[in-house]
A protein has these predicted regions:
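Eukaryote-biased recognition of intrinsically disordered, low-complexity regulatory segments
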Residues: 2-11
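Catalytic and ligand-binding motifs that coordinate phosphates/metal ions
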Residues: 221-254
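A general beta-strand register signal
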Residues: 9, 55, 241-242
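Fe-S ferredoxin-like electron-transfer domains
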Residues: 50-54, 59-190, 195-196, 201-228
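N-terminal cofactor/phosphate-binding cores enriched in small/glycine residues
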Residues: 12-72, 82-86
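Cofactor-/ligand-binding subdomain signature composed of acidic, glycine-rich
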Residues: 243-293
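Short, surface-exposed charged micro-motifs
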Residues: 14, 163, 237-239
């Protein structure tokens, strides 16, 4: 072991990792999965969801694996009874206050941890109508779990637009534009990076929203094709999601070395021309026939 590496134990496994490696990174390096919600590989951890907490022998409180650096010689438990009970409670509280029906990942976690939110009052659940202010994406705040990822992507983590932020505090906290002005009047540049990191579909492509409303959204039938954006020379990788031979949304892989999953408005939304009717000029024969008439 060099001075730059440290050793610790995770779920009984000896692990050696570089110093400053987070517990989450160390666990995943040996195949141990820790659930996350507010964490993303292309964003800085903000420790707000508490879903990734684990038990460390050098801490009385459970610690967030996404941001807590490994300590040499420490013993980490990622799925004991205390940790499991805490994650179950977090999932139940989230489900009692939000519509998580469109998050396949959270639905799977609810099932895996046997979370049952019915023991909490359903009066906490919000039932707001989606905000539809343009043809690009919608905002459904009754699905928002305040993970903060959209605010990060809009701010200094990617776009540096700062069009949205967390407004108010406590039960009244929500994602909002400045002074709650309509999105088209805000500083938003419609890059859609907020949609790309949203884990619950609180921010959703308008195309997906329309197809879901028509009961025609079929992710199991969709194909994903990688290509390079042709609008400029940066070389962003695009993932074209197609259904019934039509593009329904565009994403970008978070591990892409050029943009880390972030795109501009052209890359994310400038694809409708692909499906526009193609103009076919009349042939010489058709033109001659028109003249004769």
């Amino acid at each position: 072991m060099t001075e730059q590496n440290i050793s610790l134990t995770i779920d009984g496994q000896a692990v050696t990792v570089p110093k400053e490696t987070t517990i989450l990174e160390a666990a995943r390096s040996v195949g141990i999965d820790i659930p996350t919600l507010c964490w993303a590989e292309n964003l800085t951890p903000v420790n707000v969801c508490r879903l990734c907490v684990v038990e460390a022998d050098n801490s009385k409180a459970l610690v967030p694996a996404c941001s807590r650096a490994c300590d040499a010689g420490s013993n980490i438990e990622t799925s004991n009874e205390r940790v499991t009970k805490n994650r179950r409670m977090v999932l139940e509280l989230l489900d009692s206050a939000n519509d998580l029906s469109q998050s396949e990942e959270l639905q799977d976690l609810m099932a895996n941890y046997e979370a049952d939110s019915s023991r909490y009052s359903d009066n906490l659940a919000a039932h707001d109508e989606p905000k539809v202010e343009d043809d690009l994406f919608i905002r459904a705040y009754d699905r928002c779990v305040l993970c903060y990822k959209c605010v990060q992507a809009c701010g200094e983590e990617a776009q540096f637009t700062f069009a949205i932020a967390i407004a108010n505090r406590g039960f009244d906290a929500r994602v909002s534009t400045e002074h709650d002005i309509p999105l088209p009047e805000s500083a938003c540049v419609y890059c859609g990076n907020c949609i790309g990191v949203c884990p619950t579909n609180a921010l959703q492509f308008k195309t997906e929203f329309d197809l879901r409303s028509a009961a025609n959204w079929r992710p199991e039938d969709q194909e994903v094709t990688e290509t390079i954006c042709s609008y400029c020379g940066v070389g962003c990788t695009l993932e074209l999601h197609t259904q019934d031979n039509e593009i329904v949304k565009v994403t970008s892989p978070a591990d892409h070395s050029v943009t880390s999953g972030h795109l501009c408005v052209k890359g994310r939304f400038g694809w409708e021309y692909v499906q526009a009717p193609v103009y076919k000029p009349p042939s010489a024969k058709q033109m001659d026939a028109a003249v004769d008439d």
